[in-house]
């Protein structure tokens, strides 16, 4: 992980981001934890370091709204959706695979009413969605555009390298770890 200090210096000096590519979410978190030494202030770290994941890792607010609108006939399902809605309102990142998501919730309410509410089938309608400005996945994308260090998995990094983003925002510096 000795590459993190020079990468962060390069990003600051060049006002550009460095994408760090890893194989697993565990490695993503390990790198983010290591960066807490470079950026001990949590507020500064939140601006400079972003973990990017695919949309299938974030709660889709439209899917949650639709599930709540179809309120299931089973009281247990209604309680499950209530717990998800409560977590969503308190979550800063909506990451269903991250440390802030209570693992016991999946065991309690099942996959369909927890991680099943993510965008798993590519159904995201992006800016046409009423929740676009609050969307957890979009927040992650916007934060990555401003960050010095973006930590992502190999698949997402390769997609970014190939297609980039709006206004020619394709990253130009990459580090592949494992």
Model-derived regions, located:
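Hydrophobic/aromatic-lined pockets within catalytic cores
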Residues: 12, 36, 161-162
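A substrate-engagement module of RecA-like helicase motors
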Residues: 16-18, 22-148
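Glycine-rich, N-terminal phosphate-binding loop of Rossmann-like dinucleotide-binding domains
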Residues: 22, 154, 178
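Conserved helix/coil segment N-terminal to the catalytic DExD/H
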Residues: 138-145, 155-170
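SF2 helicase catalytic motif II
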Residues: 169-178
């Amino acid at each position: 992980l000795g590459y993190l200090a020079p990468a962060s210096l390069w990003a600051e000096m060049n006002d550009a981001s460095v994408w760090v590519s890893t194989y697993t979410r565990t490695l993503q978190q390990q790198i983010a934890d290591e960066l807490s030494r470079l950026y001990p202030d949590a507020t500064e770290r939140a601006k400079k370091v972003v973990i990017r994941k695919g949309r299938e890792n974030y709660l889709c607010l439209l899917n949650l709204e639709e599930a709540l609108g179809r309120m299931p006939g089973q009281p247990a399902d209604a309680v499950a959706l209530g717990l998800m809605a409560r977590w969503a309102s308190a979550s800063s990142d909506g990451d269903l695979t991250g440390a802030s998501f209570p693992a016991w919730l999946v065991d309690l309410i099942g996959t369909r009413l927890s991680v099943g509410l993510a965008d798993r089938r590519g159904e995201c309608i992006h800016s046409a969605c009423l929740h676009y400005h609050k969307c957890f996945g979009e927040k992650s994308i916007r934060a990555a555009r401003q960050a010095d260090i973006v930590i992502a998995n190999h698949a997402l990094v390769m997609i970014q390298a190939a297609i980039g983003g709006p206004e020619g925002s394709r990253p130009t510096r990459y580090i592949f770890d494992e």
